[in-house]
Structure formats: structure tokens, C-alpha cells
Amino acid sequence: MARAAFLFKTVGFGGLQNVPINDELSSHLLRAGNSPWQLTQFLDWISLGRGLATSALVPTAGSRYYQMSCLLSGTLQIPFRPNHRWGDIRFLRLVWSAPTLDGLVVAPPQVLAQPALQAQADRVYDCDDYPFLARDPRFKHRVYQQLSAVTLLNLTGFGPISYVRVDEDMWSGDVNQLLMNYFGHTFAEIAYTLCQASANRPWEHDGTYARMTQIILSLFWLSYVGVIHQQNTYRTFYFQCNRRGDAAEVWILSCSLNHSAQIRPGNRSLFVMPTSPDWNMDVNLILSSTLTGCLCSGSQLPLIDNNSVPAVSRNIHGWTGRAGNQLHGFQVRRMVTEFCDRLRRDGVMTQAQQNQIEALADQTQQFKRDKLEAWAREDDQYNQANPNSTMFRTKPFTNAQWGRGNTGATSAAIAALI
């Protein structure tokens, strides 16, 4: 059904006393323009390059995603305070330029002279509680597209959440022809196009763009775990990965007339998220969650079960609740094995090819782990030396998260969708 509740959740602090962002990071995020709602800003923070290296301040695509979450989590607590006073207090050195939240600017001297806002962790706000958003549905949609993506990252201590749905009824109308227009394009290219379409105009619930996005997500995830491929397609479509296990996988929408999987009737869906920290370097996983955010901005998706999220994320209207859908976690490296096992069983891959892919995946994971852990150590050292200017460049994680995620069960749950 169409979305009626526009709540969003802010970031946790990861053990710090305030939002994990400082003046230097916030200035870097806004260097291209002072409005965090600009489409160029949005497409910038969901993905950078191929996700491997960017800059010292923004080392990965996941860094940009997390840092924008921190910036919005802090600055939006200004207008969402009681009485909606938007310009009388600053977050860091920033204030909103107008009550319509058009942009962020350096606070005037009289505000800079006053103490900054002490933001709170893990807060839930309703867009309709702020009059300027409540009165402008179009701008609220544009804002909520990004706040939905932020919420999908902030609901847990792991990676961003994606929605996967399989329903034959989604293929009605001109969806099949539109899919052919994307033939040969990468998942990232398709995701960018759909994000632009969502920002330009709100999607009708279960309209063409909403159905197209859900089909693209289902094709990606069914391909990601190896359920569909060139010998077992979903209505002739699948995503072909040029080099599975590589540090920068590219998934290309492809077609094959060899064999189509038999799809059971009915509507089946689930939520999935990476639990290992290397999601930070996987643009495809980030874009998948971003597309889910586009869906959330216009449609009410099924609730995520309370037992799948921490206590601070339970019973958020429109997001989590009792008897909701289970949130399935997986370890990125282990999912490569699930992918290879399926293709080998289906006769698409040899054991030697699987061994080669898995060896590459091991090297890739070690490379990513070394980088992410080095950045985390540097951030910890910086925060100890600068207690009044703390920040995290990537979402905090623990060593245990490298081994977490019931990957086999998650892979089986995705496979069971068809």
C-alpha cells in the first residue's frame, strides 16, 4: 500500500559522546553544495567510483553513506526539537539556511557564540511533525527518499538493509519491454537511473517504476546467490558477474533463452543485509539498499520483525514491529561460496573455476579487512587525541562481525523466493 507514515531513525554514536562527525568531515561532505537534498549530492554519497578508494576523509563508498547519515542525524535534530525553532542553535558550526531546510550554512556570529546542539543517539522522528515538510508533499518525498536510505543503515549495527520480493504479478504491463532497455547495463547504472527517476517524481505505489525496481532487486539478489544464471533464468533475465569475488564486482543485466526457472505463484519477500564490515567497499550492496529506500519513500513495505533488530529500533511505526518479516544477515565472503556451489551443482562452473574464484575472494576479503581495520585504528587514535572533535570515517564494527551472519540460511531463504 502507499506510504502514510514518514518516520526516520538517526544514527547511533558507536561509543562516542556525540554524533561521530566533526567540522572537517561536514565541510568535506558539503563541498559540492550546501543542500544535502540535491540529487547530485544524493548520488554522490550512495556511491563513489568503484568503491575501493576515494580520499583520506572518505576512504570508501560506505564511508560517504555513513557520514551523510551522521550529518543528517545531527542537523535534523535542530528543527525537530519542540516548537520547531530551526535557526537558533547550531550543530557543529552549521545551521539551516531557512525554515524550509533548503541548505546548511555556517552559523551567524551570535549563534556561533552559543553552545552547539548536543544531539541524541538513535532518535526516531516523524517528517509530518515538522510543518514545512508536512505542508509540501513533493519536498517531503524528496527528503524522505534519502532519510529512508539513512534509516535502512541505522536500524542495526551492521550494513544497509535491502528488500527482495518475488511476485509474478509485478511483470504485468510494459515492465518486460522496459527491462529490455536495460539489457547490457550494469546494476549500478540501472540503480542510478532509477534513483534519478524517484527523485524527480514520486512513484505511484506498485506503478511501473516501483515494480521495475522490485524486479531489478529480485534479479540482482537471485543472481548474487547463484539461483539464476545463464542456464536458469528468471523470465530469461539474470545478472552476469564479470569476475565474482573481485574487489569491484560488476553485475550486467543479461538474457538467455536456455531455460527459465519455474516461479511459484504468490507474493514472497524478505529483508537482507550484510553483517561483515566489507560491505563498505561493495557499491552494489549499497545501491541495493538505496533502491530499497526509493521504494520506501512511496510504498509501505512489510515490517521488519522486532527480534531482528536492536531494542532501540523496535516498534518504529512503518519500519519494525511484532510478527514482521525476518531480517536475514550474511557474510560477504561466504556468499561467494554459496554462489559457486549453486553454479557448480547446475553444471555452469567447474570445481577448478570455483577454486579460482574462492581464492580470489579470500584475497579480496583480506585486502578489505586490512584497510578497514587500519582506518578504524586511526580513527580511535584520533578520537583519543581529539575528544572535542571526534568522528568515524566508517560505521563502527567489531572483529566478531567478520564471522557473523547465517549465510547459508540466508542464501536458502533467497532461493526459496522462487
From Swiss-Prot:
One term under GO cellular component: viral inner capsid
Pfam families the record matches: Sigma_1_2 (PF03084)
Protein location: Virion
Alphabetized UniProt keyword annotations: Capsid protein, Inner capsid protein, Virion
Annotated function: Inner capsid (core) component.
Family: Belongs to the orthoreovirus sigma-1 protein family.
Subunit structure: Interacts with protein mu-NS; in viral inclusions.
Protein name: Inner capsid protein sigma-2
Protein species of origin: Reovirus type 1 (strain Lang)
